[in-house]
């Protein structure tokens, strides 16, 4: 069952995101956001995109600048959330 939620991995380090995302995906949560004000956010997005391509939609939140959109895309992100 896919749940219509977006999980926000705020403040989570890149080495922690894959294990957390595995549990979220098992629970049916397949949209995962990494806020850009998290530690090494682009690395987290890259780790998630590499591991879960085709299984989940990975993206970034707290996107404030146009150049950040390109950086998220370069890291493999497919979703942008802006305040």
Report residues per predicted region.
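Ordered, amphipathic secondary-structure segments that act as subunit-interaction surfaces
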Residues: 82-83
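Conserved N-terminal beta1-alpha1 strand-loop-helix module at the mouth
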Residues: 1-78
């Amino acid at each position: 069952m896919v749940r219509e939620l977006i999980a926000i991995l705020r403040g989570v380090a890149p080495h922690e995101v894959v294990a957390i995302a595995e549990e979220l995906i098992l629970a049916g949560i397949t949209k995962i956001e990494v806020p850009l004000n998290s530690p090494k956010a682009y690395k987290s997005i890259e780790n998630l995109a590499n591991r879960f391509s085709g299984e989940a939609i990975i993206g970034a939140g707290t996107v404030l600048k146009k150049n950040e959109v390109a950086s998220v895309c370069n890291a493999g992100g497919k979703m942008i959330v802006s305040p």
